Amino acid sequence: MAIVVVTGTNTDVGKTIASAAVCQHYSRQGFRVVPVKPVQTGEPKGSGDAQTIEKLTGIVGKCFARFPEPLAPNLSAQRAGMQQLNLEEIVNKIRELDGPQTVVVVEGAGGLLVRLADSFTIADVAAQLDAPLIVVTNMALGSLNAAELTVEAAQRRGLKVLGLIGGSMPKNPDLATSLNVAEMEKVTGIPLWGSIAEGAGQLSKEAFCQLVEDLHLPTMWP
């Protein structure tokens, strides 16, 4: 039915927690939700982003490949002497998970243009799937520039950006962070659906569910 790709302005901006929020939101609306992490680096089998999403939401996800070192996937694969990912194979696997009343939530690695393999990025995956993007950004000093660059890079590739989610929002934001929240929609031209509090990954399923209700995620996208 629908596939959406969650990417970020950088690594460690809160993509996994935001992906969990998106999964929780559509699951509560009655959709069958399938979280997908095409590639995980730096985590042993049984741990990683898919497992974090499962812990927060109870929804079991898919991870297609793992490379040992916490690097860009192409570099981690190279250094381990492992075969790199294949774009067509990844796209076909994701398409196979789609179906009636299904929302497939694909979480990228790092930022929009991080190399999943030498020959492609998560932007290329989204383009092949004709899937829109959700961009996760922090709100600290410098985030306006990073968010605008990410949105611009996506749009120049013909990708639709549905919305922004702020990740790892501190309990007591400083002046720059507070102002950036107010300015984010203006500089990017993309709606900010809300921000996820710092430490949300440690919440119980019940508390995380309440947090998701405070976000302004859309019922469904056109």
Swiss-Prot record:
GO cellular component, as recorded: cytosol
GO molecular function, one term: ATP binding
Pfam families named among the record's database cross-references: AAA_26 (PF13500)
InterPro entries noted in UniProt: DTB_synth_BioD, P-loop_NTPase
Superkingdom, taxonomy of origin: Bacteria
Annotated residues for binding of substrate: 41
Entry keywords, A to Z: ATP-binding, Biotin biosynthesis, Cytoplasm, Ligase, Magnesium, Metal-binding, Nucleotide-binding
Positions that bind ATP: 12-17, 49, 107-110, 167-168, 197-199
Active site: 37
Sites where the protein binds Mg(2+): 16, 49, 107
Principal place of residence: cytoplasm
GO biological process, one term: biotin biosynthetic process
Entry EC number(s): 6.3.3.3
Subcellular location: Cytoplasm
Cofactor(s) for this UniProt protein: Mg(2+)
HAMAP family named among the record's database cross-references: BioD
Subunit structure: Homodimer.
PANTHER family given in the database record: DETHIOBIOTIN SYNTHETASE
Function noted in UniProt: Catalyzes a mechanistically unusual reaction, the ATP-dependent insertion of CO2 between the N7 and N8 nitrogen atoms of 7,8-diaminopelargonic acid (DAPA, also called 7,8-diammoniononanoate) to form a ureido ring.
Name assigned to this protein: ATP-dependent dethiobiotin synthetase BioD
Gene: bioD
